[in-house]
Structure formats: C-alpha cells, structure tokens
C-alpha cells in the first residue's frame, strides 16, 4: 500500500474507490494499491 498526496490509476485494472472519506486505488496487481494521505 502506497500512501500518496495524489493517487492515480497505474494501469487499466486500477479502480478509484472512496471509502470513509479516504480515496483509494484497488487493483489486481497488489503493487498498485494506493491510499490518499
């Protein structure tokens, strides 16, 4: 899980999801998981 100021899709499988006010990127590739912080 990477914590970044700006989260971006890194591939076409990435999905941007907002959970409890936190923007996250979910993907089939675990290296692409991100959270806005």
Swiss-Prot record:
GO terms for molecular function: structural constituent of ribosome. The keyword DNA-binding does not apply. Keywords: Ribonucleoprotein, Ribosomal protein. One of its GO terms (cellular component) is cytoplasm. GO terms for biological process: translation. Signal peptide: none annotated. Disulfide bonds: none annotated. The keyword Ribosomal protein applies. InterPro entries: Ribosomal_bL36, Ribosomal_bL36_sp. HAMAP family: Ribosomal_bL36. Belongs to the bacterial ribosomal protein bL36 family. NCBIfam families: rpmJ_bact. This is Large ribosomal subunit protein bL36. The gene is rpmJ.
């Amino acid at each position: 899980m990477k914590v970044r100021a700006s989260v971006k899709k890194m591939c076409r499988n990435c999905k941007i999801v907002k959970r409890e006010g936190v923007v996250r990127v979910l993907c089939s590739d675990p290296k692409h998981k991100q959270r806005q912080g």
